């Protein structure tokens, strides 16, 4: 007797019968925006409550030894949560979303809908020097992905729903709907069309509205424009953009080096936790501005005017009360932030690089303006404005996302009057870093593996194909010791123009090219004289079962082969790829991507 369908199956069946997929996509976009804003609210609530509980009683004018303890405790608790509750890797949130889009048909695991919120909340609340944005983007994307899986959406709609989740996360956490939209286009590289624009906008607006309801109207950054932009500050804006480009390059290279170092300690988790925790705690003790996301320190730079304000930036540190050392403090914090972020994630914490890029950008912009004004390198430039522009510049460089940098900072602060200088800084920053790095910090790992989805439709189609979608397994392997007479009967049963030659372990030794032996297979007097190993040839190329599809296409172009064998790391034959099927699949994906 067949089992009765469950409630979800009945709901999906009803939807397929009464609601079109297009209409359902719009409904899901609204739901995704709502849930993403709720997730962002919970994360910020967790972080805020933990930080209030731990640090509200600290005397601002003196250092506190508890800064040496809290970060290590937070990372340890996060590690326990991930190891015993989640039991999965949840690091590199935005990179994980890009990977899912490129290689997993936009499918993210169910626990990603909540696990990053809890893990990053603990990490940041206890002082981890990372951001909440990447975990929320992963959460929003996972909500979109899982809803898409429940309602059995096609591959293209799945990508769109993941994009809705990511855009809603950014829009909700920053109350910046336009920034959420352009983030999805620039960073996740979801193609914009009329079919995709409306769902993403619905998610962004919904998330923003519910964030206002849940968290009030207060903006994340408190900025009031008191010194309007003037044309004679253009040279300073250009130089700030170049400076931000090099700061972004330093951030990316240092992060990559630190990640590589901690990866070497993967087999020693407690050593990694202790080592990274000590580095993080020491840096936070010396520079308390590194505690958590650090947005409170950035806000002081945005509205500070007096020595008392600058002392607040250096509160709880050994620098407190020495406002003459502000430039040194700002420079050291800018330099060490990347190590604090790397130590947090490398030792077992959970968080992103979105907030650190904003933090470093704000401090770098203030540092640039203060040095410029101290040494009178040109006309006076307002430090608060350049703090803001530095945030946009470094974010643009790190993420290769100039529109996101421009619109996010403008929406966050209401600083639309600074649109022109923001554009100048972001353009110069992107031009500078593009000389050294062609991909964002999120895309760099995937680009090296050939798994990055881009706006280039040909490259995107190749990336989306995936090895498993084109591998064929209807082959007839033969033994190298098989007599030629029996080979003839195997040829008669084969639908291909080649036969793979394998040993008893299944390892590929060569191939029999039927077109090459056709002239002798009907000579019966040779049937006992020759064996397969005397007739086999080496294939013109061999494909690995984990080879990037760009390399697969390249080998077909170089060899002009009709088929190429696919083997695993031990050389065991796993199947073959035919040129005909490869290009047929490619053309179908291009057609699907081009359709509205």
Stretches with model-predicted labels:
Residues 474-478, 534, 539-542:
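Structural signal for short hydrophobic segments within the conserved structured cores
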Residues 203, 425, 472, 514, ...:
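ATP/adenylate-binding site constellation spanning eukaryotic-like Ser/Thr protein kinases
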């Amino acid at each position: 007797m067949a089992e009765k369908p469950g409630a979800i199956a009945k709901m999906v069946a009803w939807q397929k019968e009464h609601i079109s997929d297009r209409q359902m996509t719009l409904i899901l976009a609204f739901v995704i925006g709502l849930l993403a804003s709720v997730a962002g609210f919970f994360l910020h609530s967790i972080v805020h409550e933990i930080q209030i509980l731990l640090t509200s009683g600290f005397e601002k004018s003196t250092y506190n030894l508890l800064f040496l303890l809290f970060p290590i405790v937070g990372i340890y608790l996060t590690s326990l949560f991930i190891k015993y509750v989640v039991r999965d890797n949840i690091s590199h949130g935005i990179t994980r979303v890009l990977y899912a889009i490129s290689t997993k048909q936009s499918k993210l695991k169910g626990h990603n809908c909540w696990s990053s919120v809890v893990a990053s909340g603990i990490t940041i609340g206890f002082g981890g020097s990372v951001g909440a944005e990447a975990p929320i983007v992963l959460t929003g994307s996972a909500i979109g992905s899982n809803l898409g899986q429940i309602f059995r959406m096609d591959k293209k709609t799945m990508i769109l729903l993941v994009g809705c989740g990511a855009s809603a996360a950014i829009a909700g956490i920053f109350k910046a709907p336009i920034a959420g939209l352009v983030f999805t286009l620039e960073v996740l590289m979801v193609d914009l069309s009329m079919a995709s624009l409306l769902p993403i906008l619905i998610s962004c607006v919904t998330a923003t509205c519910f964030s206002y309801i849940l968290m009030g109207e207060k903006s994340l950054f408190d900025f009031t424009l008191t010194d309007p932009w003037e044309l004679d500050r253009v040279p300073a804006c250009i130089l700030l953009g170049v400076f931000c480009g090099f700061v972004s390059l330093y951030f990316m290279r240092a992060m990559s080096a630190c990640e590589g170092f901690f990866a070497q300690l993967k087999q020693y988790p407690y050593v990694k936790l202790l080592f990274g925790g000590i580095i993080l705690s020491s840096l936070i003790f010396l520079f308390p501005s590194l505690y958590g996301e650090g947005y409170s320190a950035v806000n002081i730079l945005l509205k500070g005017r007096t020595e008392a304000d600058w002392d607040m930036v250096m509160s709880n540190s050994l620098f407190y009360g020495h406002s003459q050392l502000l430039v040194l403090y700002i420079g050291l914090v800018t330099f060490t932030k990347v190590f604090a972020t790397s130590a947090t994630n490398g030792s077992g914490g959970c968080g992103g690089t979105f907030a650190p890029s904003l933090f470093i950008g704000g401090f770098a912009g203030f540092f640039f303006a203060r040095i410029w004004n101290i040494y009178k390198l040109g006309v006076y430039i307002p430090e608060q404005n350049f703090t803001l522009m530095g945030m946009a510049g470094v974010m643009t460089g790190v993420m290769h996302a100039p529109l996101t940098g421009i619109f996010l900072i403008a929406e966050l602060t209401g600083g639309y009057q600074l649109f022109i200088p923001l554009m100048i800084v972001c353009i110069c920053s992107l031009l500078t870093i593009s000389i050294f790095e062609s991909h964002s910090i999120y895309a760099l790992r995937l680009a090296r593996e050939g798994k990055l989805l881009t706006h280039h439709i040909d490259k995107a189609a190749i990336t989306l194909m995936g090895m498993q979608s084109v591998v064929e397994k209807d082959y007839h392997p033969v033994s190298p010791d098989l007599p030629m007479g029996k080979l003839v009967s195997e040829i008669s049963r084969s639908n291909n123009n080649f036969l793979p030659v394998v040993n008893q372990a299944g390892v590929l030794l060569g191939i029999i090219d039927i077109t090459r032996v056709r002239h002798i297979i009907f000579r019966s007097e040779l049937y006992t004289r020759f064996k397969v190993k005397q007739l086999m040839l080496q294939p013109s190329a061999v494909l690995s079962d984990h080879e990037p599809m760009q390399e697969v296409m390249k080998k077909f172009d170089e060899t002009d082969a009709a088929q190429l064998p696919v083997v695993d790391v031990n050389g065991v034959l796993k199947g073959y790829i035919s040129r005909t099927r490869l290009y047929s699949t490619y053309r179908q994906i291009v057609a699907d991507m081009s359709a509205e």
